[in-house]
Regions:
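Active-site loop/oxyanion-hole signature of alpha/beta-hydrolase fold enzymes
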Residues: 32, 41-42, 46-82, 244
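Catalytic histidine-centered segment of alpha/beta-hydrolase-like enzymes
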Residues: 230-243
């Protein structure tokens, strides 16, 4: 499996894992500041970008092996791990499978999955139902806007829309990744020992904000940082604040 990755900066290793339909470009707003403090590793998940796109469906556990492959190829035995959305589910599988490879864990806008998962917000359910009837670019624009919070920075929706057009996901790869979002480690997360921070926007229309409370109740000692009024892509809405929160937690 060829997994495309890059490394920026020095310091303690920090692995970033993106979510559904986003390549490693999805971390761009926070890269410069993080790279001043850490050796930042980011990669394209299988099914997107410059990484291989094997036939799906994928599981989050399979995608976690890709993340471990990046650590191996980078010569990193142990790293801090930040995962967003589907990337947060992958990060959970990673730390469950190889707890010795994870120093501290940051789970962003994500879920533990399973029967206790709070339901997807109605706005996103309606959008998924309506999207097939819309012009593809209109649907994409709606999905971009839906992933932002109550008062996003001026021009951010335009910027993200343009980037999504420049970096279209492979349709089969997107479907294969989406299938991974239905897989989860189950009871195993109750034994996660890595210090864990859960970061969640209170206006997330994609992942129900109540998922943060469920995760915190499952992972021993987990801390929660709620970002008032921010949406699913809060690290695009307020990148500086996110870097500060993560850096203070990681040390």
């Amino acid at each position: 499996m060829n997994i495309a990755w890059d490394s920026t900066g020095d310091g303690a290793p920090l692995l970033l894992i993106q979510g559904l339909g986003y390549g490693r470009w999805g971390w761009e707003p926070i890269m410069q500041e993080l790279a001043e403090r850490y050796r930042v590793l980011r990669f394209d998940n299988r099914g997107i970008g410059e990484s291989d796109k094997p036939a799906g469906p994928y599981t989050a556990a399979e995608m976690a092996t890709d993340a471990l492959q990046v650590l191996d190829e980078a010569g990193v035995e142990r790293a801090h791990v930040v995962g967003a959305s589907l990337g947060g589910m992958i990060a959970q599988e990673l730390v469950v499978a190889e707890p010795g490879r994870v120093d501290k864990l940051v789970l962003c806008c994500t879920t533990a999955g399973g029967p206790d998962m709070p339901p997807m917000p109605e706005a996103t359910v309606k959008l998924f139902m309506e999207a097939p009837t819309l012009d593809p670019q209109v649907a994409l624009r709606r999905f971009v806007e839906n992933a932002l919070g109550e008062s996003p920075p001026a021009g951010l929706a335009d910027e993200l829309f343009a980037l999504r057009l420049q970096n279209p996901p492979d349709p089969a790869g997107w479907q294969a990744q989406a299938a991974a979002g239905t897989t989860f480690p189950g009871a195993a997360i109750d034994s996660i020992a890595a210090p864990t921070l859960i970061v969640q926007g209170t206006a997330d229309n994609v992942v129900n904000p109540l998922n943060a409370e469920v995760l915190a109740s499952r992972i021993p000692g987990a801390q929660i940082e709620l970002l008032d009024g921010l949406g699913h892509l809060f690290f695009w809405e307020r990148p500086g604040e996110f870097v500060r929160i993560v850096s203070e937690f990681l040390g």
